UniProtKB/Swiss-Prot annotation:
Name of the molecule in the record: Serine--tRNA ligase
Comment on protein domains: Consists of two distinct domains, a catalytic core and a N-terminal extension that is involved in tRNA binding.
Classification lineage: Bacteria, Pseudomonadati, Pseudomonadota, Gammaproteobacteria, Lysobacterales
GO BP terms: selenocysteine biosynthetic process; seryl-tRNA aminoacylation
A Pfam cross-reference name: tRNA-synt_2b
NCBIfam families from the UniProt entry: serS
Organism: Xylella fastidiosa (strain M12)
Subunit-structure text: Homodimer. The tRNA molecule binds across the dimer.
PANTHER family reported for this sequence: SERINE--TRNA LIGASE (PTHR43697:SF1), SERYL-TRNA SYNTHETASE (PTHR43697)
Amino acid sequence: MLDPTLLRQQLAKLAECLLTVRGFTLDVAALEALESERKRIQVHTQELQSLRNSKSKAIGQARSKGEDVSALMAEVAAFSDDLKASEIALEEIRTELEKVALDIPNLPQQDVPLGADERENVEQARWGVPRTFDFAIKDHVELGACHGWLDAESAAKLSGARFTVLRGPIARLHRALAQCMLDLHVSQHGYEEVNVPIIVNADSLHGTGQLPKFEEDMFSTQLGEHRRYLISTSEISLTNLVRNEIIEADRLPLRMVAHSLCFRSEAGSGGRDTRGMIRQHQFEKVELVSVCKPQESEGEHHRMTRCAETVLEMLGLPYRKILLCTGDMGFAATKTYDLEVWLPSQGMYREISSCSNCGDFQARRMQARWRNSVTGKPELVHTLNGSGVAVGRAMIAVMENYQNADGSITVPEVLRPYMDGLSRIG
């Protein structure tokens, strides 16, 4: 959520900026009307509260002198209903304003390129050279079918479209990838491993920005009156660990990593990537989350992105680093780097990691703060999140980049200790 003072004091400028850089239309007239009404009700409420306080003081003084207070009590009773109604009206209009504020996306940093969509993203760097094959290559679906490793038919019987059953060596490779990533981030990158719930409440989704705007993207479950949501990323669970907390300065930065199942409805995918495992309803991800002081978030963003890059480099997978333009960034992000891995079957790079600095946007929604050791006062933290990386897509990239002419897959050296020394599967 943006700083409310921007909505109150710089509304026209904010609306122009949001339209230009985010393509988001803010109803200025409606907001001005709401804010004007809020001020009117607040002034009226404060006047009645002041009157109540003065009358209460007068009643106390009169009682101490043994005087009759019935007339004063009658005066208080006369406006108490009005005060109660005014307080309720004030709370209602504040809730209305907050609903509007919760739908407004974050503002980009000044160095984020202006653009409408992914076509205007800016490539920052490349690593590795795509392999040249001397045989007809297969995509991951064909490779999986050769050995019965990827079973979409059974998954469809169990759950429907966009699910896959992994069998045998490929299931083992998938597990090895996740374990290897966790070990790297914990042992070498200094992240704390956290095992988090994958079912969360609505407050958690409001905190990180998935609700109320993106409810259609979420799977949910209802038990009696209690509605819960399946996480689309463990960023939700990890980041909300600091919701309504004040963190001492010497504990920052907090760096957490989790490997979890993730669930997405893919409501806005428009029928893209229906073949294979590129876009699934259920998938696994190793997620990185950092919570830090505001002045440290830019450096932390570069560090986190570098940690994700290291995963691809240790696997020997060619990739490129992309700075997203204003029109392609996520709702809560103020700056985002995507990492795209090379898929030989498609002859192109595909997203495998997205690392975002959210500034104080999520922290304000969560009331996540740190205690400034100089002033002693609580201030909003900055939050960051990034895939370190998507496990299924890493598996696809390994299958395709390490395939052999006979359909077997060479196991990357870094994964062999996790697979009892196997150098090849299939």
